Amino acid sequence: MFQMGGVGPMMGQAMYFQRIAKPNGDEEPYSIRRYVEESRRLLEVLNTRLAGRQFMVGDEYSIADMATYPWARSYFWATVSVDELDHLNAWFDRLDARPKTQEALQLPEPRPSAFGEGDIDEAAKKNAANFKN
């Protein structure tokens, strides 16, 4: 599955090196650049896939959308640009508008900073502190 073999791992690494390792004093510019660039490439693949489709597998919302959305939608947290990815951004809008998506975003607590709202730097520091050795 695209999410498990690509988007999830790459976005996860982009977030880790920027939001956990770097605030804890372990900055690795090559790793950050590598994972941000690969995450962008994968989001471009997804953007192409979404051309002419409402959802990843056609016009029906599916487990593929459910699994990929949280990772892809966290692009801001991973500092991955989604500029000019019109099909991807339209897909975000469709999924963001779903009532169950909004409900899920409140669990276990509201997390607006993950989606580019609020103070991302403060959220990153708080998150990184949970992973100190």
Sequence positions of predicted segments:
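Acidic/histidine-enriched, glycine/proline-rich intrinsically disordered or flexible terminal extensions
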Residues: P108-N133
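A generic alpha-helix propensity feature with a strong bias for hydrophobic helices
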Residues: R73, Q102, R111-F115
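Segments of small-molecule ligand-sensing domains
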Residues: L105
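GST-like fold's C-terminal all-alpha helical module
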Residues: Q3-K100, K132
